[in-house]
Amino acid sequence: MAPKKPNKKNVIQRRPSAEKRILTAQKRELINHSFKSKVKTIVKKFEASLKLDDTQATLSNLQSVYSVVDKAVKRGIFKDNKAARIKSKATLKVNARAS
């Protein structure tokens, strides 16, 4: 059978620039999602090092948490306040372990 032609009433007409923006938004969504996942992974790694009471690894992981969260803000993935909350929680956990 021949392929079915789309019904013109159901097709949304878009300008080429709008089509490009849709594709670009989809690409950015994938990139942003993977970066958010990376942040979550690093935070979990930091929390795991806290449970092991490994001071050197904890401080190293704290620096990586700070770094990756700041990069997320720079890229526009996180807002400033969300980054501040994540960093504050991490620092509070380290200080609670130290005392």
Curated annotation (Swiss-Prot):
Single Gene Ontology BP annotation: translation
GO CC annotation: cytosol; small ribosomal subunit
Listed GO MF terms: small ribosomal subunit rRNA binding; structural constituent of ribosome
Domain of life: Bacteria
Pfam families, per database record: Ribosomal_S20p
UniProt KW keywords: Ribonucleoprotein, Ribosomal protein, RNA-binding, rRNA-binding
UniProt keyword Chloroplast, yes or no: no
Family statement drawn from the similarity comment of this UniProt entry: Belongs to the bacterial ribosomal protein bS20 family.
Role this protein plays: Binds directly to 16S ribosomal RNA.
Protein name: Small ribosomal subunit protein bS20
Organism listed in the record: Chlamydia pneumoniae (Chlamydophila pneumoniae)
